[in-house]
Amino acid sequence: MKYIPSILLFFFLLSFSSCSTKTVESELPEPNPPTPVIPEEPTPEKEKMLWFDAEANFERFSKKENITYYLDLAKSTGFNKIVVDVRPVQGDALFKSSYLTPLTDLADTHIERDWDYLQFFIDEAHKRELKVTVSATIFTAGLPSSKNGMAYRDDTWDGKTCLEYTKDQGLIDIKDDKTKVSAFLNPVLPEVQDFCLNFIKELVTNYNFDGFALDYCRYPGDESDFSEATKTAFEQYIGKQLDRFPDDIFIWNTDGTKRTGTYYKKWWEFRSMVIRNFVERVRTEIKNVKPDIQLEYWAASWIHAIYGQGQNWASTEYDFSKEYSWASPEYKNTGFAGLLDTFLCGTYLTKIFGLNDPESIEYGIARAQRIVHGACKVYGTLYALNHKDNIADAVYVCLSQSEGLMVFDIVQVIEFNQWAAIKEGIQRAESL
């Protein structure tokens, strides 16, 4: 049996020899996957808006061919959005409404249309890839100069227009004050707010547009409103009874200045809170119907001078009381920038350059950005009449130093033939 181990040895050596002929490959590391190339998000094109005022263009845009002609011109100039004003301060409407009277008469002009003014603008603008913001004045109700408008023909509004506290005439209804641009309804009244919300909701529901701009969404001035309804609302706001109203707020001096009363600062705070709370209601109504519609608001850039109108378009982060003697520490809580998508900053100033010059467009935009504090977008806006010869520079500053541009109004752009200059300003800003 000695041959058995020999055979086993033979096979063992054979197997070893076979294994030794194999090439042993070293393990290679897993290759690193290539880094994915993520395309950069394109920078959104800034909005460049041209305003079509209802009153100034009432006769011109009574013809469809005029509308399409100027939409073409706006597009070729570089605008990508228009603002269609559908309710001027007279208070009637250029859209189909169950709440407002159709606007057929303005000054000495009578126009009746058998077509929908707003719908035509929307359709033709969208054909040209122009976005549309619809603008409406909010608390306006007629013209004191001519006693024309809803406040004068409908006794529903008797006692609901603002009661002014004036230096020379005492308490008077704003309807009888021919120095005022419009007979304002009293913003504090629930029935007034509900009425305005109804026509806003109607607009948003029945028409498809891209933005809604609040205009004249404010008090008419520091003389209004001193009605019993406002006195009661103010007493509820501060939790105290007023013994001497309106002297508790201020007394007019013979030179037109004011002698401040006990509740002077709280009064401005209260009125701004009325407007702030109404803007919040508007936002809720709009977003409930069409969440994508952008809420916009136009106001003058000189915010320190319009507290008498109840317009605190700043962020709640900005404390006015540290800079202005008229502001309470709580005034900042009335800021409504955070309720807006876009603030249309009214830099309607003749000077363009000068970051340290409070009378310049550059300063107005920079201040707005500082006190809005990122709560919403800020667009620089221009009054074309102020820039007959230098609108290119004004357009350039607004577009390069803010998040968008609005030019008011097409009537001046037409009158002074500013199309080419505006286009040059847009192109200069977009070449940066």
Q: Which residues does each PLM region occupy?
A:
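Aromatic-lined carbohydrate-binding/catalytic grooves of carbohydrate-active enzymes
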Residues: 79-113
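Catalytic domains of carbohydrate-active enzymes, especially glycoside hydrolases
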Residues: 65-92, 206-210, 333-345, 401-405
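Substrate-binding cleft of secreted/luminal carbohydrate-active enzymes
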Residues: 326-432
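Aromatic-lined carbohydrate-recognition surfaces of secreted/lumenal glycan-active proteins
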Residues: 131-139, 213-220, 264-325, 375-387
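Aromatic- and acidic-residue-enriched segments that line the glycan-binding/catalytic groove
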Residues: 94-106, 140-176, 216-255, 308-319
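Active-site-adjacent "subsite" loops/lids of carbohydrate-active enzymes
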Residues: 41-61, 134-206, 253-264
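Bacterial Sec-dependent N-terminal signal peptides
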Residues: 14-43
